[in-house]
Amino acid sequence: GLVSDWELFDNMDGRSRALTMIESVEAIIKFWDDKDTYNYKGEFLDISLTKNVLSELGIGKFIKPFQKPYPEIAVSLKNPNSMTAKLAGEKGWIPISGNFVNAQDIATHWPTYKEAAQEIGKNPSYDKWRVGRSVLITSSDNEAKEILDDPMGVFTNYFLYLNSVSKLASGTAGNDINLQNEIPDAMKKAKDLIIVGSEQTVTEKLIHFIDTVGPFGTLLLTGHDVGEKKQLWKNSFSTMSNKIQPILNDYIKQKF
């Protein structure tokens, strides 16, 4: 959640938030399994629902998934050597590396996940790993440069938001954040982390990205505010799916 959520629920401690998340998942799974009553008591959560139940009207009953035992659980990863990646490996959850994370940090996610899984006798395939990235294929590299150089552009605004949220969360800035002063850093982040350019350039950048982070099963393309460039984005997704994806699939199979 956002730092504003942390304050709202009086939970500013990162460790307790992480453990509460784990307990929340455990409680949900338990409720999916339980037939009639719902009880869960952990270090951070104490949940009970036994009295105010009227099954005929669906009151006090949780909807249970059709998929058994339950749908796969996925978690997002950000930090290098992420403890969440370790937890996901132990639990068999789907790891998803964030699109706003640099490639060097992402490169630590799968090894951390795999090592944790192997410690309990599992041998996961990298096909399970999903990696997020912001990708835009333009008609030319010059068009890509114009988009990245726009101080009010979609990618600048995206990282302006993320950078500001991160500063609030770190506690180093308080509420004193001058958004105008944050624009240069947001533009730099966009240029560092967004994969944008002509079809050939994007293909080359994605291959370099794979060389850095290692093989993965799914590339998740991040959605952005398309604004007046709806057709550009539609063309980009189409080119990515029909032309570039097969190249990347072949590259991973041949190299790894």
Show the residue positions of the predicted features.
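Active-site-adjacent structural elements that line small-molecule/cofactor binding pockets in enzymes
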Residues: 1-256
